[in-house]
Amino acid sequence: MENLFLVCLVPPTSIVKDVDEIRNYIANEFKVYESLKRPAHITLYNPVKIASEEMEKRFFYALSTAAFSIPFVQLLQNFSSFPQHTFFLDVEKNPGIMDLQSQIKKALAPLDLRTEQQKFNPHLTLAFKDVKPPVFDAIIKNFKDRKFKRTFTVSGFSVYKHIDKKWRPYKEFPFRNPQDNPATRDLFSL
């Protein structure tokens, strides 16, 4: 048994429809299709392979301990890129998303999952992998004067599982009140 999981935020359906419209436009206009193979999402923890049922239980338990958070409003605004390979919607680095990602990373650290976790730079990918430099430049030029702005309330996070060569929704972690977190409760408070 070996399963591949992705921890992420998935915007509401109305925003996903807007994002998919942009991704389809880019695919049709520039002949780059790789991003269409994945659901619209904001990665909170890079994909991780888990090879045993016991480790999978520990993984999901650790994630449940990271779900003690208060809802926050997330802003997606305008377009940006990682030079020459990835074009994306910019995701505001607000305290809510930064704290959530930090909690998830901290909760999973004891599992020693050995995934490459770079500095967290939240984004929602529109085109990557199959984007060659001349096409990348054309996409940037096409979108340089375009604007995009959507907000949504984040009240939990998702885990997707790679099944039959596709990422599929697998488990939801709705936020729980941080005051109910047994790990932070003071024994001597009332």
Where are these regions (language model features)?
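Basic, often amphipathic N-terminal segments
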Residues: M1-V73, N94-F148, D164-L190
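A short, structured active-site edge motif that brings together acidic residues
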Residues: L76-S80
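Hydrophobic residues embedded in beta-strands of well-ordered beta-sheets
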Residues: T86-F87, W167
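Active-site/acyl-donor-binding loops of N-acyltransferases
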Residues: Y160
